Curated annotation (Swiss-Prot):
The gene is tig. It is found in: Cytoplasm. Involved in protein export. Acts as a chaperone by maintaining the newly synthesized protein in an open conformation. Functions as a peptidyl-prolyl cis-trans isomerase. PANTHER family: TRIGGER FACTOR CHAPERONE AND PEPTIDYL-PROLYL CIS/TRANS ISOMERASE (PTHR30560), TRIGGER FACTOR-LIKE PROTEIN TIG, CHLOROPLASTIC (PTHR30560:SF3). It comes from Shewanella amazonensis (strain ATCC BAA-1098 / SB2B). This is Trigger factor. It is an enzyme of class 5 (isomerase). Its main location: cytoplasm. Residues 160-245 form the PPIase FKBP-type domain. It comes from the Bacteria.
């Protein structure tokens, strides 16, 4: 086998491989002989079909199969000999073959050589937060509001009330599509409507008719309404005030707490909030570390890996919307290109961190991750057993653990400053509510 390597552009490589033609002919003849023994052709006894007949009927297909096998086998031997690391499947094209040699060209991309830099320049503001008694009380108040009942109130509407309204919206005196409703129920303070709408209802009583002036946000989804001033004619038909449940043993039972009453409920709430806080703190630091790593290391990305990641994201998008990929038009690659490129780049860089620091997955960490995730379920032991019995899920958790270890390794060389933050403020930002 003779091999020549050519760098065409970027990460693309072209291997020209030639092997003795007799290798092809030998394998073709062996395959034809095997086919002759089992061929069933009218006019000939089994095993007695002349080779010329077998060759005429099956020769082209057999030669194609043999050629494919020869190319694949010699390609693997060539990349091992040349110490190349393909980042995707090759494409094979025939070369300048003759009676003495069979030549083909394999074109493919290789993984980039990653040399990490700027790790000591990564800046991380590490948030520090705790779940306080006030945070637990605030969560209980939220739960009370979620389980409130509503009764008609003979007073003016205020924050937290539910109102039932009829409304008609207009821009420049013209009604617009989607701007009209009857019997529409709205909780004041929910933020469901555009700015100023809910505020304009406060202070009015059932039976009143009035108008409010608002402006649609510039980022509003309807193109024809972005930034437009609008007027809404409103009829307020009902005002319903919230009745919050008392915090007692019966309230605790609503959340599955049958023993220990309110104190047990508070303990359970604190445990859940602490778990969510820990996850959010980790995610915040990880994002900062990854962003710093990406900013300091610009590497060329194999198109094959990006295309593969786009396909994964495309399938996930279809699944999220409950669709069947076979029955849906293919979502354009542009929708996922930026995210795919980031994921590929992060994967390559973290892979180099793991390699250069010789990290090995910590099984104790894997089990801790599974236990933390399982604690959110009704029967944690059952979830833990299920994960430990599923090879694919366990491999996923090992990957998560190893990625955590890589981030921690990067954190050791980063410039880290700590910042005390309040639970509510931090969690609101983490969940996009701020």
């Amino acid at each position: 086998m003779q091999v020549s390597v050519e760098t065409t552009q970027g990460l693309e490589r072209r291997l020209t491989i030639s092997v003795p033609a007799e290798q092809i002919e030998k394998l073709v003849n062996e395959s034809l002989k095997r086919e002759a023994k089992r061929a069933r052709i009218p006019g000939f006894r089994p095993g007695k079909v002349p080779m010329s007949v077998v060759s005429k009927r099956y020769g082209a297909a057999i030669r194609q199969d043999v050629t494919g096998e020869i190319m694949q086998r010699n390609f693997v031997e060539a990349i091992i000999a040349e110490k190349l690391n393909p980042a995707g499947a090759p494409t094979f094209m025939p070369g300048a073959s003759d009676a003495d040699k069979f030549e083909f060209v394999a074109t493919f991309e290789v993984y980039p050589e990653v040399e990490l830099k700027g790790l000591d320049a990564i800046e991380v503001e590490q948030p520090k937060a705790d779940v306080t008694d006030a945070d637990v009380d605030s969560m209980i108040e939220t739960l009370r509001k979620q389980h409130a009942t509503f009764d008609a109130a003979p007073r003016a509407a205020e924050e937290g009330d539910k109102v039932v309204i009829n409304f008609v919206g207009s821009v420049d005196g013209e009604e617009f599509q989607g701007g009209k409703a009857e019997g529409f129920e709205l909780q004041l303070g929910s933020g469901r409507m555009i700015p100023g709408f809910e505020e304009g209802i406060k202070g009015h009583k059932a039976g009143e008719e009035f108008e409010i002036d608002v402006t649609f946000p510039e980022e509003y989804h309807a193109e024809n309404l972005k930034g437009k001033a609008a007027k809404f004619a409103i009829t307020l038909t009902e005002v319903k005030a919230a009745n919050l449940p008392e915090v007692n043993d019966e309230f605790a039972k609503l959340f599955g707490i049958t023993d220990g009453g309110v104190e047990a409920l508070k303990a359970e709430i604190r445990k859940n909030m602490s778990r969510e806080l820990e996850q959010a703190l980790k995610a915040n630091v990880k994002e900062q570390v990854i962003n710093g790593l990406l900013a300091a290391n610009d590497i060329e990305l194999p198109k094959a890996l990006i295309d593969g990641e786009i396909n994964v994201l495309r399938r996930q998008a279809v699944q999220r919307f409950g669709g069947n990929a076979a029955n849906m038009p293919e979502l354009p690659a542009e929708l996922f290109a930026e995210q795919a490129e980031r994921r590929v780049k992060v994967g390559l860089l973290l892979g180099e961190v793991i390699k250069s620091t010789e990290l090995k997955v910590e099984e104790e960490r894997v089990q801790a991750l599974i236990a933390s995730m399982a604690s959110a379920y009704e029967d944690p032991a059952e979830v833990i057993e299920y994960y430990n019995g599923n090879k694919e899920l366990m491999q996923n958790m090992r990957n998560v653990a190893l990625e955590e270890q890589a981030v921690e390794a990067l954190l050791k060389s980063a410039k880290v400053t700590e910042k005390e933050v309040a639970f509510e403020e931090f969690m609101n930002k983490a969940t996009g509510r701020a």
